[in-house]
Amino acid sequence: MRTSVIPNRLTPTLTTHPSRRRNDHITTRTSSLKCHLSPSSGDNNDSFNSSLLKTISTTVAVSSAAASAFFLTGSLHSPFPNFSGLNAAAGGGAGGGGGGSSSSGGGGGGWFNGDEGSFWSRILSPARAIADEPKSEDWDSHELPADITVLLGRLSGFKKYKISDILFFDRNKKSKVETQDSFLDMVSLKPGGVYTKAQLQKELESLATCGMFEKVDMEGKTNADGSLGLTISFAESMWERADRFRCINVGLMGQSKPVEMDPDMSEKEKIEFFRRQEREYKRRISSARPCLLPTSVHEEIKDMLAEQGRVSARLLQKIRDRVQSWYHEEGYACAQVVNFGNLNTREVVCEVVEGDITKLSIQYLDKLGNVVEGNTEGPVVQRELPKQLLPGHTFNIEAGKQALRNINSLALFSNIEVNPRPDEMNEGSIIVEIKLKELEQKSAEVSTEWSIVPGRGGRPTLASLQPGGTITFEHRNLQGLNRSLTGSVTTSNFLNPQDDLAFKMEYAHPYLDGVDNPRNRTLRVSCFNSRKLSPVFTGGPGVDEVPSIWVDRAGVKANITENFSRQSKFTYGLVMEEIITRDESNHICSNGQRVLPNGAISADGPPTTLSGTGIDRMAFLQANITRDNTRFVNGTIVGSRNMFQVDQGLGVGSNFPFFNRHQLTVTKFLQLMSVEEGAGKSPPPVLVLHGHYGGCVGDLPSYDAFTLGGPYSVRGYNMGEIGAARNILELAAEIRIPIKGTHVYAFAEHGTDLGSSKDVKGNPTVVYRRMGQGSSYGAGMKLGLVRAEYAVDHNSGTGAVFFRFGERF
């Protein structure tokens, strides 16, 4: 299965028509909203499958009262981070602008761009080049003496000039601009580029009208090789000192239409025009919603204003970067600063489009990617979405990740995409698209395994090869409501399956209270048959092999699982089963067997069933509650996992069994040091602390006794080698140290029967000479799915190497 949040870059650019300037005041026409989807290659294997990468490019329309705004346009590349089978990505936008200032407009002052030449578009898109830049690398020599200054107007209109370098000179500071200054990125001319006089003049005009500068000039200096060095000298625009800062969300506000000023207006009419613009802007921002920016960032920006003095272009750029960095760090990947207003009024108003969600769209795709009618009911998917992803909320990348995890947990889809895109009907807002590819409803699977049984003389023959395995079938998503019917059949010998045939058939019915009910309960009904080797009848150290006892269980089970949260669930139900104990010859046996000193086998061992006949039937209630707060840090699990289970006999069945069997398991995964999280980063060392208690009050058949020893109990011992008891306690500690690609670990464990072995019928612990308690220690290494470890048990004082599948905890 592949699930992904499509990595999007929401790349907004403001496109305006040529502006007109009168008395340092600029008017622009509104821009249009366009969204373009284009794929970009990307591949991420952070312990999960590769994800499909896409890019969203969008033009965000923003406009305000023309005389009192500072427009920001541009692009910010901030992709969603990927993770483990559930890749989440998003992009953010940035702002830019241009404009001018007005001394007669009161609250006026702003930057606007003309002819797509805004300063912020340039500074945020450094790879941009002049549209009609010639592709040819041929260029002409200036044919002038070296080291002389040439004004732009003195260049020939018929030549193509090579620009060797570009220098920015700040007239206010009377110094060259440092290489790290963002002003160097705003010009579209590039060192080594070839340009005509018309292109250079167009660049100068674009810089002069962007509102960034009070004055800007361009001149060249001749080089001996025929190329030109370009110097751009400028005086930065400045506004009045400000001591107040306000941030507003304009994402869902209707964009105002700017009114062009008549160039033939009298001075009195111009003043009145500016005042109307100011009143309109104040009315507009008074109805705006406050942005999500916290008070701490507000205070930080106020300190920036106090330290700076007069408001400058560089200061507004720093404010924009600080505001947007907070949004993107908090996961609001579609948020962007689009406007600064109220300049020259001692208050800077920052307008932000935060990415308000106006619509949720769920689409089902076929194998070719075409939109089709899905089998899954819409509410099944919708109930898995966090509320932060619903209309009326602000899009957040973490909500997108959570949606992926939740939808993936349904196990109904082969591919999942969460894709935020601009809403063309509501400027500045977001539509969340969820695209799903459904799995086939019916599936069947066969897994095989071969075993070799020694023949005569101990040598295997071709006839001794036994083909075994499991056949599984599933019909999922019945009626589109995620109901399923699954079945499996397992045997170690398909040629003679009656010896150990095991099966399970289960029907799952989620949303027991209705798909629209927030209560999350699932009903499961199953019938089963299984056979397992009983660890109760196992010899202790130095005891010859004890004849095996097999326990067959067949019955039905019905339970309800209620998920309180993603971390906590409660399961309760009824179990009715028949238990039959058999010896190695597959005969029903009522007692365990033991080897006598003369080598003979005696059948007078501990009783195997409660009834004494080898066959028990019983019914009991079962309930367990689990709380799992674990998570992965660079592939290593940390957190805690706790489980409590109770089985309550009802007095129904053989000998009217009435009992209470209970278990408590507590496991802590303690992170020993902080590490940087991300793909390819090293995992932290972890200390694992584990405790398990089991106890029983009332009737206790031997097959339900608690056993000690084995790969999932006390390591270093065989299954049940320490003892079988009515009450047990296990304690374990393990420290995991990461190494390249895996981890090594050391452990120590102890298990005790708390003196309760004698309370089990027939006392199998004493009969088979087991100690009733034991400790072990050792070390190991994780090799893929295999644990390779060396363990020493204290009861015998010997050690051995073990290879185990799966995890101990």
Curated annotation (Swiss-Prot):
Single GO term (MF): protein-transporting ATPase activity
Transmembrane segments annotated in the record for this chain: 144-152, 161-169, 226-234, 248-254, 358-365, 411-418, 428-436, 443-452, 465-473, 501-509, 554-561, 570-577, 685-693, 706-714, 777-783, 798-805
Pfam families: Omp85, POTRA1_3_Toc75, POTRA2_Toc75
Membrane topology: Multi-pass membrane protein
Result when mutating E133Q: Reduction of processed protein by 50%. Reduction of processed protein by more than 50%
Bias kind Polar residues: ranges: 1-17
Topological domains, Cytoplasmic: 153-160, 235-247, 366-410, 437-442, 474-500, 562-569, 694-705, 784-797
Disordered as annotated region, ranges: 1-44
Result after altering A129G: Reduction of processed protein by 90%
GO terms (BP aspect): chloroplast organization; intracellular protein transport; protein import into chloroplast stroma
Cell compartment(s), UniProt: Plastid, Chloroplast outer membrane
Effect of mutating A131P: Reduction of processed protein by 90%
One GO CC annotation: chloroplast outer membrane
Keyword terms: Chloroplast, Membrane, Plastid, Plastid outer membrane, Protein transport, Transit peptide, Transmembrane, Transmembrane beta strand, Transport
Segments in the Chloroplast intermembrane topological domain: 132-143, 170-225, 255-357, 419-427, 453-464, 510-553, 578-684, 715-776, 806-809
Tissue: Mostly expressed in young leaves, also present in old leaves, roots and stems (at protein level).
Transit peptide location: 1-35, 36-131
Physiological role: Mediates the insertion of proteins targeted to the outer membrane of chloroplasts. Required for the import of protein precursors into chloroplasts. Forms the voltage-dependent preprotein translocation channels (hydrophilic beta barrel) of the TOC complex in the chloroplastic outer membrane. The narrowest inner diameter of this channel is approximately 14 Angstroms.
UniProt note: domains: Transmembrane regions consist mainly of membrane-spanning sided beta-sheets, which are not predicted by sequence analysis tools.
Record family assignment: Belongs to the TOC75 family.
Subunit structure and binding partners: Part of the TOC core complex that includes a protein for the specific recognition of transit peptides surrounded by a ring composed of four proteins forming translocation channels, and four to five GTP-binding proteins providing energy. This core complex can interact with components of the TIC complex to form a larger import complex. Chloroplastic protein precursors such as prSS (precursor of the RuBisCO small subunit) also interact with these complexes. TOC75 interacts with OEP14, TOC34/OEP34, TOC86/OEP86, TIC55, TIC110/IEP110 and CLPC.
Official protein name in the record: Protein TOC75, chloroplastic
